[in-house]
Amino acid sequence: MKIILPLMIGALLGLTDPAQARTLDAIRESGALGLCAHPNALPFASKAGNPPGFQIELGQALAHELGVSLRPDWIITQYQMRSAGCDIVLDVIADREAQGETNLKISKPYYRTGVALAVLPSSQLSSFKGLDERTKVGVLVGSIAAMTLGQRHVPTSTFGFEIDSLEALVNHEIDAAAVTPTMASYFNQTHPDKAVRILDLDESEPNLSWNVAVGMVRPDDALRNAVDQAMERLSADGTVERIYHRYGVTLQKPK
């Protein structure tokens, strides 16, 4: 199973009760689209709202396309999703296996991401293939990167959050950090004096790259089609790219 940041993928989210699911007509009748998001997880989302996070901004744009407003449903753990009653989750892995038991329905993908290596500007590393028993890599606990590197006997240092791994990197405690390009890019934007070099995704490692989509909680066909069409419009007119760029993130096209 592919693992990424909390609330970035549906694999970490619990099922809502089927009775809580709403159709497109019900969403339009209520006037609001519910988005489950973490209240303190920039660049993804922030309840404080300064900045709001790209999930909130994209959620607002998507809701506008559907003719409604956005209602953020703030959750911290997977268990809260059962009672939150949200309609969508953003930045989920577009892979049924990765969704586990969430049963989230997946839109067409709108960008590609994964786990990349962040290194110091002076590092000679250029890919995962360059890692060996002499390079220590920061990984998230229980992540696919941790498992992949462990199988190769690459020394790792475990962290609970990507920001901690990046801080350890700039403090010369590790040689590289296995993180999402999203978080590394935002780190560079907010720490210009400590900017790291982000290596390209290694597509030769199939478990370390994936497409990203909108996760929908038991939608009807009308909602699925409406979300797909809305996201296609927002991608075509540059809205999606502009939103992520405000957080220092350059999107890659899905494959």
Predicted regions and their residues:
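Bacterial N-terminal signal peptides
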Residues: 2-15
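Hydrophobic residues within well-ordered alpha-helices
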Residues: 62, 81-85, 131, 169-170, ...
